[in-house]
Amino acid sequence: MSYGIFQEYYLTHQTLSGNYDLTGIIGMTSNGVMYLSMPLLFALFTKRWAKFRQTAMLSGTILACLSFLLSSFSTQVWHLVATQGVLACFGSALVFSPMTLSLGEWYKTDHRALAYGVTLSCKNIVGSVCPFLFSSLLGRYKFSSTVRIWALIIAGTSLFTIFLIPTHPSALPAAVSDLTEGANEGGDAGPPRSRKIPWPSLRHGTIYIYSIAIILQSAAYGIPQTYLNTYASEVALLSHTSAIILLTLFNIPGIASFSFFGYLSDNKHSTFSATTVACISAMSSGLSAILLWGLNTQGSLATLILFSITFGFFAGGYSAT
């Protein structure tokens, strides 16, 4: 969510060997690795490896921490691509995929989108704080120490929260699983729903239309995260502080928009269908990118602030639909 800070640092402090144009693909590669690996991970952890979800999340955390730690010893630009762009993000996917599946099983259908929205908004909370954190650490401790500190933060927060996620029933002893289901029969949450991979859905053309839309939206969402900070500094000639504020303003609206669009998708009394809500998010974010950034040849600060807030709100809420 805050890779633009590192991107600018790599370009202004060229201490590594290699082609520095490659640093621009790290942010996009990280998104691509996560999005492309998640369908396979979802399929594996839905049923076959459901009891290994916690193990996968712990392994993913360790992989992400080790990847950032290894990146602190990089001597070539491609080392950063391999560690930060590929390995660290695959570790993140190992955490995110089982967590997402568990979330969908322990919440009722009526509130699933809202639950996803609240959970996904956490990444925007982190993305709102990290630009200032990374900028301060890079200015004081330089690159190597910064990524090592970040690896420690990941380890401390992730290992603690992973154990708060309820264990999948297939990993519990039979007696405990029966007691859990019996206790939930009269409760609001209900027993965990058994999930199966809906293979017949692949015969419907609608799923491919949605897949293409998600791919395009996901690819576009990562561009401002990577290049907005550099654009503000090199094209708009804004100060370093202004560039950091733009990236923060890009992330802050997503904190509310995830929950908002999740609520609209869940609300059966709303006049908007789930498809309409997704279209509102996609079309509004697309128009803001064209009108507020694409046609903004002068790169004024006011217009870029408006773009960051508008695009961050509407594009951020797409995942919750």
Please annotate each region the language model reported.
Residues 112, 119-173:
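Helix-loop-helix hairpin linking two adjacent transmembrane segments in secondary transporters
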Residues 175-210:
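Juxtamembrane intracellular "pre-TM" segments in multi-pass secondary transporters
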Residues 251, 267, 271-321:
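C-terminal transmembrane helical hairpin of 12-TM major facilitator-type secondary transporters
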Residues 3-10, 199-263, 270, 275, ...:
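Extracytoplasmic gate region of multi-pass secondary transporters
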Residues 36-78:
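Conserved MFS/SLC helix-loop-helix module at the cytosolic interface between two early adjacent transmembrane helices
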Residues 6, 10, 85, 92-108, ...:
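Intracellular juxtamembrane helix-capping segments at the cytosolic ends
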Residues 37-52, 257-272, 292:
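Helix-to-loop junctions at the C-terminal end of transmembrane segments
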Residues 64-68, 77-94, 102, 215-216, ...:
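Hydrophobic core of transmembrane alpha-helices in multi-pass small-molecule transporters
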